[in-house]
A protein has these predicted regions:
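Active-site beta->alpha loop and helix N-cap motifs at the rims of alpha/beta catalytic domains
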Residues: 71, 84-150
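Glycine-rich, proline-tolerant flexible connector loops at the mouths of alpha/beta enzymes
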Residues: 47-49, 67-96, 198-205, 260-261
Length: 293
């Protein structure tokens, strides 16, 4: 009986280690079809809590392969002005970390397929407690976490183990300025995909050298089998297509989020902003898909 139990536990372990996360499955499917991922970023609760879940569903209809949700935080050091303001609006509307996670749970009621990644900072997670935070995320159907201020080290390795127990991915940022040793640790610890920051600076920075980005992406690809997605500075179909030539996916945030800047509580303006966001999604999707047609 003892042997049987051991055999069962070993089989269960093998089964668990074989399970692909939703993020991994999505990239696998895209690769089989010769397609690249379009990953929009929106801030949870921006411009108000009522908008987020409905917008997530609309983003999927308009070509999102995965959705990145920002967790509002009062001191967002890596975020440019556009995303920082979105966070302020969300906090003004009382969107807490737990409420943001609840939005994902609501989205999951009718969408079991599209991966959702949360991007945020350590502090709000530490207030809840790492284990409880990951448990809440897992129950809600979150697939990956990107904590901007959690560097790849012993702490992140421990956190990585917690995430693996819940079949979730830990996403890390790599930048043009990342030192070799740190890059090595990121490629060892990261899973799901690598988020390559295309610019030296903060989100929404302006000058994007697509040829330089492609060169860096190709270099990273010689060191890892993980998909590489590029974010920061992608504003239109042309830049998305140029980036998707070498990368496995493009992440677009500021270019979408900026449409909520001046809407306030005006329902008509919010509707108009959403239409502009979805129109931009169509442009990006079409441009990226031209690569595989």
């Amino acid at each position: 009986n003892y042997d049987k139990l051991n055999h069962f536990l070993f089989q269960a372990f093998l089964f668990k280690s074989r399970i692909m996360t939703r993020i991994e499955r999505t990239f696998d499917t895209l690769k089989q079809h010769g397609k690249k991922a379009l990953i929009p970023y929106i801030m949870a609760g921006d411009p108000n809590p009522e908008v987020t879940v409905d917008l997530m569903h609309k983003l999927v209809v308009h070509g999102a392969d995965m959705i990145e949700i920002g967790l509002p935080f009062s001191d967002p050091m890596a975020d440019g002005k556009t995303i920082a303001l979105a966070g302020e609006r969300a906090l003004m509307g009382s969107t807490s970390t737990k409420k943001a996670i609840e939005m994902v749970a609501k989205f999951r009621q009718t969408n079991q397929k599209t991966p959702v990644l949360l991007m945020g900072y350590l502090n709000p997670m530490e207030i809840i407690g790492a284990d409880e935070f990951v448990q809440l995320c897992s129950q809600a159907g979150v697939d990956g976490l990107l904590l901007v201020d959690l560097p790849p080290n012993e702490t992140s390795a421990h956190f990585n183990q917690i995430l693996k127990n819940y079949a979730m991915n830990q996403i890390f940022l790599l930048a043009p300025t990342t030192e070799e040793e740190r890059q090595k640790t990121v490629l060892e610890q990261g899973s799901g995909f690598i988020y390559y920051v295309s610019l030296k600076g903060v989100t929404g920075s302006k000058a994007l050298d697509t040829a330089d980005v492609s060169k860096h992406v190709e270099q990273i690809k010689t060191k890892t089998d993980l998909p590489i997605c590029v974010g920061f500075g992608i504003r239109d179909g042309a830049s998305a297509k140029a980036i998707a030539g070498s990368a496995d996916g493009v992440i677009v945030g500021s270019e979408l989020v900026r449409h909520f800047e001046k809407v306030g509580d005006d329902a008509d303006k919010i509707t108009q902003a959403i239409e502009q966001i979805l129109s931009k999604m169509d442009e990006l999707r079409q441009a990226i898909d031209e690569l595989s047609s």
